[in-house]
Each structure stands twice: as C-alpha cells, then as structure tokens.
C-alpha cells in the first residue's frame, strides 16, 4: 500500500461543505479510504487525466467532479464541483 502525501486546499473544503450530505459522504470515503490504497492515479476509479494540463486529473462521482494535481507522490485536492462548473474553475 502506498503512502500518499495529501493537501486539501481551502477551496476544496469549502466546495465540499456546500454539497448535499450524501455526496459529501461518498467523496470523503473516496478521498480518505479508497485513494490511499492505490499506487498511482490511473488506479483510482473513474479518474481521467485532463488534456492540456500536466499532472492534473479529475475523478467522477456521479454528477460531481473532484479536481486534483498529482506530482511526486503528492496529491493536492483543489476543487469538488458539479460537472457543469468544474472545467470553468479548474485547473
């Protein structure tokens, strides 16, 4: 099992608090329980590398997307927004 270094940006925490409770729980489970058991981003369920943006990825959780950056074993979570908003505000 790989040990990730995490950083949650203030924007990520703020976005998360504004989501419906059921979506919040899914995202918390994914971020804190499932992702730490993966070795690299392609192993994370529903993840895609963003085109034209080095080291930036998104994870699909229903109609919501988690925007993060992965470099050198470190994940920085930037945003979690509805699919209509995420690409306007991330990266």
From Swiss-Prot:
InterPro entries: RelE/ParE_toxin, RelE/ParE_toxin_dom_sf, TA_system_RelE_toxin. Gene3D superfamilies: RelE-like. Keywords: Toxin-antitoxin system. It comes from the Archaea. It holds the Pfam family ParE_toxin. Toxic component of a type II toxin-antitoxin (TA) system. Its cognate antitoxin is RelB2 (Potential). PANTHER family: PTHR38813, TOXIN RELE1-RELATED. Belongs to the RelE toxin family. This is Putative toxin RelE2.
């Amino acid at each position: 099992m790989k040990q990730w270094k995490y950083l949650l940006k203030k924007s990520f925490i703020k976005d998360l608090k504004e989501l419906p409770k059921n979506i919040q729980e899914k995202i918390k489970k994914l971020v804190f329980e499932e992702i730490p058991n993966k070795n690299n981003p392609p192993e994370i369920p529903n993840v895609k590398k963003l085109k034209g943006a080095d080291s930036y990825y998104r994870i699909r959780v229903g109609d919501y997307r988690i925007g993060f950056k992965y470099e050198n074993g470190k994940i920085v979570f930037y945003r979690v927004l509805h699919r209509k908003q995420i690409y306007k505000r991330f990266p």
